[in-house]
Amino acid sequence: MMKLNLFINANETESYIDIHAPKMNDHVQSIINAVNDLDKSHTLVGYIDKEIHIINVSDVITFQVINKNVTAITSNQKFKLKLRLYELEKQLPQHFIRISKSEIVNKYYIEKLLLEPNGLIRMYLKDAHYTYSSRRYLKSIKERLSI
């Protein structure tokens, strides 16, 4: 059981969080990730032709670079974004994982993984398609997915 203390002090100039724990573990790390995600963007602006759409980040399955444009792919739409992939990566919550130079995947949409003989990971996503990780990101992917 975790204990929570809240201290309201009018003399404080900004809000901050201190975490006290006997050791670092998955539970503590998930709290840190949740707090860090509070400052992250939860919506994005996407374009379909000349239409402007507000996209809920949690609906995005993957962000891919297609013909030099960053595209947000949901279960039923593809939206062009005006951000570069590296800019987007900084804004996204922790459950988005960079898997290659041209793709970021929402880990909540990963259905299963297949380790290929060549060292790549084939990721099957819930929208019935699959994608591949690059070797360069393999260590990071394994850490983020705890495999």
Swiss-Prot record:
The protein's name: Uncharacterized HTH-type transcriptional regulator SA2153
Q: Where in the cell is it found?
A: Cytoplasm
Q: Does the keyword Cytoplasm apply?
A: yes
**GO CC annotation terms, alphabetical:** cytoplasm
Keyword tags? Cytoplasm, DNA-binding, Transcription, Transcription regulation
Annotated InterPro entries: LytR-like (IPR046947), LytTR_DNA-bd_dom (IPR007492)
Major localization class: cytoplasm
